[in-house]
Amino acid sequence: MFKNFLLIILISTIFCQDLTTDKEELKIMKRNNNSLFIDLNKSDIEWLGGLKYSTKDHFGKIKIKSGKINISKDYKISGTVIIDMKSITNDDIKNEWKKNLINHLKSPDFFNVDKYDTAQIKIISSKIIEKLNNDNFLMQIDAYLTIKSTTSRARFNTVVDLNSSIKTADGTLIFDRNDFGIQYRSEVHIYDPESFWNKVETTKSTAMDKIIKDEIKIDFSIKTKPEFILVE
């Protein structure tokens, strides 16, 4: 009986040691993994755009659908972020015109979200511009921006924290909507058969045809999920 008891204790000890080893190896795997998923609930994207002759811009939010960032040991960044174009909102208008603006932005005149429901930012390279006092880095990012199935190069700066378990990136991206065929009341005009505006022949040559800013500003604050829970 005593021998059986000792045998049970020995087997239990060996099993617990193996289990502990597996857990330690699992943690090492997680911490060495370079791929981080964006925390959709803690990341924010705000858009700004408006009229050329107004001191106030329209602005609102848009949600990230999914995103994955890769960070190498020498702090090189790559990855892809998918934007949910149907989630676009407006925050500056407080009356019944809010819904009208949102619907117009979703229409073929602008982003045509029924046909193109996502946009994409694909980071292709990065470089450190300077190390900041708080151990964060100011980095230059080169990326491909795809909107309405049209892809254009984009370059922007971001302040990143790469040393914490939760990585962060804050910055601003500015793009010209004409690069993606969004030319409603723009300085540049190319015929788009999907746009209602192209059917209004009488006002195309007036000043009102060029009243909306071509540049759209995107302010972003991105946070990843903790790296130690991510396993490929």
Where in this protein do the model-derived segments appear?
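Sec-dependent N-terminal signal peptides
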Residues: 4-13
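Low-complexity, acidic/polar, glycine-enriched regions of mature
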Residues: 17-232
